[in-house]
Amino acid sequence: MVVAGIDPGITHLGLGVVAVEGKGALKARLLHGEVVKTSPQEPAKERVGRIHARVLEVLHRFRPEAVAVEEQFFYRQNELAYKVGWALGAVLVAAFEAGVPVYAYGPMQVKQALAGHGHAAKEEVALMVRGILGLKEAPRPSHLADALAIALTHAFYARMGTAKPL
């Protein structure tokens, strides 16, 4: 199973693709990883357009069975939520155009799936990603580590039969 994971952000969007191997213990290979960067000085339409184009290009290249995104929770940061929504919209349109279903997972679900408990630190989750992917070091920067964790989380829930598309 090939899964694209996305940590949505308008300035830094984590984008990772993994190939999950067989059954049994969760093991996977890293196929692609990057952080798509945009500048706050650019017009919004250019930032969103660049994110959309890059995500669509990766989806066409790797042909994942699913796109998994991190659900965002903003309590008092309305402007940040608004701008992250731009990035998420670009991802949703790219997934639609590529014909790939989209799934969303919250931070607690990611921690539970990869570390076995919902209160794991980011570093603990990154180390689990490193182990599952067989990497020498934990993925960096954090946006990439989060994107890969989200992709692996989808693989975990898909194996359990509990994954539901947006």
From Swiss-Prot:
Cofactor(s) required for function per UniProt: Mg(2+)
Cellular component GO terms held in the UniProt record: cytoplasm; Holliday junction resolvase complex
CDD domains assigned to the protein according to its UniProt record, in alphabetical order: RuvC (cd16962)
Catalytic class of the enzyme: hydrolase
GO BP field: DNA recombination; DNA repair
Keyword Iron-sulfur found: no
Subcellular location(s) of the protein: Cytoplasm
Matches recorded under SUPFAM superfamilies: Ribonuclease H-like
Keywords, alphabetical: Cytoplasm, DNA damage, DNA recombination, DNA repair, DNA-binding, Endonuclease, Hydrolase, Magnesium, Metal-binding, Nuclease
PANTHER family xref list: CROSSOVER JUNCTION ENDODEOXYRIBONUCLEASE RUVC
Subunit note: Homodimer which binds Holliday junction (HJ) DNA. The HJ becomes 2-fold symmetrical on binding to RuvC with unstacked arms; it has a different conformation from HJ DNA in complex with RuvA. In the full resolvosome a probable DNA-RuvA(4)-RuvB(12)-RuvC(2) complex forms which resolves the HJ.
Domain notes: The wedge motif stacks with DNA close to the Holliday junction point; Arg-76 interacts with and eventually disrupts the T:A base pair cleavage site, and subsequent to cleavage may prevent their reannealment.
Protein name: Crossover junction endodeoxyribonuclease RuvC
Organism of this sequence: Thermus thermophilus (strain ATCC 27634 / DSM 579 / HB8)
Upper taxonomic lineage: Bacteria, Thermotogati, Deinococcota, Deinococci, Thermales
The gene coding this protein: ruvC
